[in-house]
Amino acid sequence: MTAQTMQIGNRPCRIYGEAHAEYLLLQMTGEHELQSMESEIAAIAQSAHHFLFAAIPVESWNDALSPWEAPAVWGKQGFGGKAADTLCFLTEQVIPTLKQQYPLPENVKIILGGYSLAGLFALWASTQTDLFYGIAAASPSVWFPGWMEFEQRHPMQ
């Protein structure tokens, strides 16, 4: 399956799949994940479901995906707590643009996924909105300072 690149906001998003999809899969990605993207898409394509997959690049991983500010855990870079901005980008730019460019059904099932800190972002996003049909959090960074306490007080929607 060949990727198309679509500029959404100021980000070059990789789009795979087809219009009229039953599922819209959104994955926040870092540069390190793009090398294995083709095999991930091939595995998803083996299902019997029609899908549209958008790989959304994240530049400042620690800032854009962290739900609140926190000091550095490893190394020197702390966390900027800009997950709300990233979620807003998804809901106000990415999803509307994809729905405009691809004739997706009104009831398309939206699944947000991510690995590591992007997995934590996906879990956090599910506590902020009921927009997502499902969450795929692979090895989420639940070690993030304050996450366990937050998660107990804020159920997934």
Task: Give the residues covered by each predicted segment.
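Non-catalytic cap/lid and distal C-terminal segments of serine-dependent acyl enzymes
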Residues: 1-157
